[in-house]
């Protein structure tokens, strides 16, 4: 990695993908590879569509069982006055959580809120499900669904085609209004408004423009609703790109499992989403300040008239190979201070630039120490951490590799997340490229 000009600091790198944890919690790691209990390969070869409705029955205070004329069943389960779940498995599977490998969960332990009254009525060819904040109309002849906000009288969701159960995916088709806009889908690099676009709900392990780094099967609409597909499987959301005024949602699953939430505005809809999945991480105070990422335990610096100007008035050129120059280190203890991570902290301070956090190993093969043991390297990292904290800066690491020690790996590239956090005081993780999603 290229390093900054020490005096001007004009080459500070911007951060686009980090995970800040204080303290770090390994229980919040999102599963990157998962599969549902019903394998897609077991899905029917031919496509199936939802048919007309025979009847609907309230089976408990929050749940309605819908029976179609082809004997397929759909469950509508309310998780609050304005949040409901639509589940349909034509192979006969019961309502369940999606399977994840490694094990993970999407919903919080207590995702439900009180539903004061759920009524089911049938009139003029429609079955109507009503709470204080949602009205669902099911067309008995077509099986199509409309969802209304009774507080405004507005139709916020309208199916325009039956749900399609294909051999490899399930597809939902909704109406798009001309003035309707869509936001969400997780980290869609460089994209936040999706009208007229197709977005991928999958980890593409990409951190460049247009890639997907950390997807979420959730979006919200300015029409007054949000949607979360309850799955870990890959998906694709088409917001009028293929067909104008049509939204097509699909996931590589053999069954349908969607949460809909009806509310007005981004804040309310996001709070509904948080009711199901939990509140987002609140960044620590230092996380709102600038961060600095680079490698300070790998490269050599040799005098070169075309190199970078340093404080001693000389110019140096950087090399990852031993070019006979001075090798850098975290703490500048080898007569190499100006090439150290400590020097970076001091430069920010000398230029009156607030620095919140520093990652000293952000480069392939860098590591964070030059001793023969992992414990020795962690002690070296702790020394930097102590110095950084005295100057109001927290330290972190690029994950790069596994989080725990492995036999046969050199001390330079060994990791021990427990000791890094507990002993060295690491408070930041950058998780791109390796480990997460790799």
PLM features: residue spans?
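Bacterial N-terminal signal peptides
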Residues: 16-27
């Amino acid at each position: 990695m290229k390093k900054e000009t020490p005096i001007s600091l004009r080459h500070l790198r911007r951060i686009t993908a980090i995970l800040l944890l204080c303290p770090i919690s390994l229980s919040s790691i999102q599963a990157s590879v998962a599969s549902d209990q019903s394998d897609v390969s077991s899905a029917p070869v031919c496509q199936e569509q939802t048919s007309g409705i025979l009847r609907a029955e309230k089976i408990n205070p929050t749940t309605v069982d819908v029976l179609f004329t082809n004997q397929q069943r759909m469950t509508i389960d309310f998780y609050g006055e304005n949040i409901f779940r639509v589940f349909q498995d034509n192979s006969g599977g019961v309502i369940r959580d999606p399977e994840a490998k490694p094990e993970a969960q999407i919903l919080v332990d207590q995702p439900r809120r009180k539903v004061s009254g759920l009524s089911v009525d049938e009139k003029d060819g429609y079955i109507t499900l009503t709470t204080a904040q949602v009205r669902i109309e099911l067309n008995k002849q077509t099986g199509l669904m409309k969802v209304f906000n009774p507080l405004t009288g507005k139709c916020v969701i309208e199916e325009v085609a039956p749900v399609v159960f294909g051999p490899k995916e399930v597809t939902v088709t909704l109406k798009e209004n001309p003035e309707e806009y869509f936001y969400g889908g997780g980290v869609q690099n460089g994209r936040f408004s999706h009208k007229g676009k197709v977005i991928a709900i999958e980890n593409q392990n990409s951190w460049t423009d247009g890639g997907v780094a950390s997807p979420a099967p959730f979006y919200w609409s300015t029409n007054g609703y949000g949607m979360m597909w309850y799955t870990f499987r890959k998906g694709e959301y088409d917001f009028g790109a293929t067909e104008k005024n049509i939204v097509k949602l699909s996931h590589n699953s053999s069954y349908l499992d969607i949460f809909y939430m009806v509310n007005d505005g981004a804040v309310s809809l996001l709070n509904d989403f948080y009711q199901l999945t939990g509140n987002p991480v609140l960044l620590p105070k230092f996380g709102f300040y600038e961060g600095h990422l680079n490698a300070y335990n790998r490269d050599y610096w040799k005098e070169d008239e075309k190199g970078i100007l340093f404080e001693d008035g000389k110019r140096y050129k950087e090399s990852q190979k031993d070019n006979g120059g001075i090798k850098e280190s975290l703490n500048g203890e080898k007569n190499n201070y100006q090439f150290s991570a400590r020097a970076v902290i001091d430069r920010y301070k000398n230029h009156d630039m607030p620095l919140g956090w520093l990652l000293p190993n952000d480069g392939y093969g860098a590591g964070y120490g030059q001793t023969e043991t992992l414990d020795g390297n962690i002690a070296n990292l702790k020394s930097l951490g102590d110095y950084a904290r005295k100057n109001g800066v927290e330290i972190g690491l690029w994950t790069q590799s596994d989080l725990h020690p492995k036999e046969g790996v050199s001390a330079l590239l060994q990791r021990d997340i427990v000791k890094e956090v507990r002993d060295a005081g690491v408070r930041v993780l950058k998780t791109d490229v390796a480990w997460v999603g790799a």
